[in-house]
Amino acid sequence: MGAYRYMQELYRKKQSDVMRYLLRIRVWQYRQLTKLHRSPRPTRPDKARRLGYRAKQGFVIYRIRVRRGGRKRPVPKGCTYGKPKSHGVNQLKPYRGLQSIAEERVGRRLGGLRVLNSYWIAQDASYKYFEVILIDTHHSAIRRDPKINWICKHVHKHRELRGLTSAGKSSRGIGKGYRYSQTIGGSRRAAWKRKNREHMHRKR
């Protein structure tokens, strides 16, 4: 096995003594830093490379912290208007995963870069920490690389805001295989409409 394979096996056993100690030290270190900061290199190089990262010019890693749990609806004095169904304030859960939310926040802050992918690095009682792989599409090393220059096209601007990253597709229920039959046709709504609509074929 290569070195990256050993690193991958380490992260599969997060309850081992080594990983518990390592993650505890890391989350303490991350708590001292700002919630969004640039990382000089990926914390998990094996995972980053599998998601498309390469140690070359134009690739950037940013680390972000996201508060765990649900969100309280930001309404004054709990006054929500409308039907009782929409009166909830406290126990509301996000429709998307925290990883997708983390990608969105990084993408909004760093609008000149493109979000390629992201991965989990640590968590504690209050926060989850992710590293996001970003790409500088104006760098000549990226534009000349046929393996990655697809992301330079304008259609890939703000992929993270449209659910086109891996975490975003996971939140939308999109994938391949029998487990994802509920989104055949592009989305849950499209699949529902196709299954529940009666087709009246016109006889000619």
Curated annotation (Swiss-Prot):
Pfam families according to UniProt: Ribosomal_L15e
Biased composition (Basic residues): 190-204
GO MF terms, alphabetically ordered: RNA binding; structural constituent of ribosome
Region of interest: Disordered: 185-204
GO CC annotation, single: cytosolic ribosome
Domain of life, source organism: Eukaryota
Residue ranges the record marks as coiled coil: none
GO biological process: cytoplasmic translation
Alphabetical UniProt keywords: Ribonucleoprotein, Ribosomal protein
Classification via NCBIfam families: PRK04243.1
Family affiliation: Belongs to the eukaryotic ribosomal protein eL15 family.
Protein name: Large ribosomal subunit protein eL15
Organism: Drosophila melanogaster (Fruit fly)
